[in-house]
Swiss-Prot record:
High-affinity receptor for interleukin-15. Can signal both in cis and trans where IL15R from one subset of cells presents IL15 to neighboring IL2RG-expressing cells. In neutrophils, binds and activates kinase SYK in response to IL15 stimulation. In neutrophils, required for IL15-induced phagocytosis in a SYK-dependent manner. It comes from Mus musculus (Mouse). One of its GO terms (molecular function) is interleukin-15 receptor activity. Residues 1-32 form the signal peptide. The chain crosses the membrane at residues 206-226. The keyword Cytoplasm does not apply. Residues 136-145 have a biased composition (Polar residues). One of its GO terms (cellular component) is cell surface. GO terms for biological process: cell surface receptor signaling pathway via JAK-STAT; natural killer cell differentiation; negative regulation of neuron projection development; positive regulation of natural killer cell differentiation; positive regulation of phagocytosis; response to nutrient levels. This is Interleukin-15 receptor subunit alpha. Residues 33-205 are extracellular. Glycans are attached at residue 51. CDD domains: CCP.
Length: 263
């Protein structure tokens, strides 16, 4: 038989064992202030977390043009791991796919800034009165074209399909060098503006003056030929009149001689 002393120790140990067993069976207590970290990111989806505390629930939102795939969920919840006592979000199952109802919408076209390039080109003389691109220093977002003697405006490329656009540019003028400015916007009409040097303009004026003088000389020569030709038919008529006037005078003189002879 056990001694009374051993029995006393056994009775005192029972409450301790019961307390240890109760602590093992009870769940771990959550530490105050425990929060979840930021949730993981999902492709084509966004989330705005309002509360990071345990047991809070949040939802993902698919971006514009996408929608939630069937069988997936946008809901996540902040829970705590009982083994490690660490809070975390539940694994999201959301998948965002492109919305087929928006497939027929075309994307917004991007705006392309026109580019202005300049390259030298040898001037070509012409008999026509040329046109010029009037230069404006420090001018932006405007394009002005004026007609002036000594310059020329010629189209360089055909109009491409689409709308025409005009870009802002600054034009400069060199007195002795012909410059060609080409406007090249994406889907627009491009113009080549050629400036002729003063030497070429002077040659053009000389050629025009020479042509005018030649035409005037031809007109004068034609008038003289017509005048000479018109004067030629009048001479036979005058000879015939003079002959007719001399014949009666001869007849009268002969008749007088006959009368004198008869007497």
């Amino acid at each position: 038989m056990a001694s009374p002393q051993l029995r006393g120790y056994g009775v005192q140990a029972i409450p301790v064992l019961l307390l240890l067993l109760l602590l093992l069976l009870l769940p771990l207590r959550v530490t105050p202030g425990t929060t979840c970290p930021p949730p993981v990111s999902i492709e084509h989806a966004d989330i705005r977390v309002k509360n990071y505390s345990v047991n809070s629930r949040e939802r993902y939102v698919c971006n514009s043009g996408f929608k939630r795939k069937a069988g997936t969920s946008t809901l996540i919840e902040c829970v705590i791991n009982k083994n490690t006592n660490v809070a975390h979000w539940t694994t999201p199952s959301l998948k965002c796919i492109r919305d087929p109802s928006l497939a027929h919408y075309s994307p917004v076209p991007t705006v392309v800034t026109p580019k202005v390039t300049s390259q030298p080109e040898s001037p070509s003389p012409s008999a026509k009165e040329p046109e010029a691109f009037s230069p404006k220093s420090d001018t932006a977002m405007t394009t002005e074209t004026a007609i002036m003697p000594g310059s020329r405006l010629t189209p360089s490329q055909t109009t491409s399909a689409g709308t025409t656009g005009t870009g802002s540019h600054k034009s400069s003028r060199a007195p002795s060098l012909a410059a060609t400015m080409t406007l090249e916007p994406t889907a627009s009409t491009s113009l080549r503006i050629t400036e002729i040097s003063p030497h070429s303009s002077k040659m053009t004026k000389v050629a025009i003056s020479t042509s005018v003088l030649l035409v005037g000389a031809g007109v004068v020569m034609a008038f003289l030929a017509w005048y000479i030709k018109s004067r030629q038919p009048s001479q036979p008529c005058r000879v015939e009149v003079e002959t007719m006037e001399t014949v009666p005078m001869t007849v009268r003189a002969s008749s007088k001689e006959d009368e004198d002879t008869g007497a």
